[in-house]
């Protein structure tokens, strides 16, 4: 029998996990944390543009109009639009000599 044949033949215990006691609470906790970390990392990579855009710009929107009567909402929209219209006329042309 050659040495190569003996090396290629695995023993039954060689393929088994050394720490096969899965009832250990530390092993269970580490497995759960590892799986959650992997799931969160995958979601972060898939949706990072949406997530970080919402974090960056989500809080900078105007005040909430929930519970405000429609007439006051329309008045607020008109004020905002008039402020934008006024700002449109304030461009300065600079000519370089």
Curated annotation (Swiss-Prot):
Pfam families: Flu_M2 (PF00599). Residues 60-83 are annotated as: Disordered. The modification Phosphoserine is found at residues 64, 82. GO terms for cellular component: host cell plasma membrane; membrane; virion membrane. It is found in: Virion membrane; Host apical cell membrane. HAMAP family: INFV_M2. Homotetramer; composed of two disulfide-linked dimers held together by non-covalent interactions. May interact with matrix protein 1. Belongs to the influenza viruses matrix protein M2 family. Cytoplasmic tail plays an important role in virion assembly and morphogenesis. This is Matrix protein 2. The gene is M.
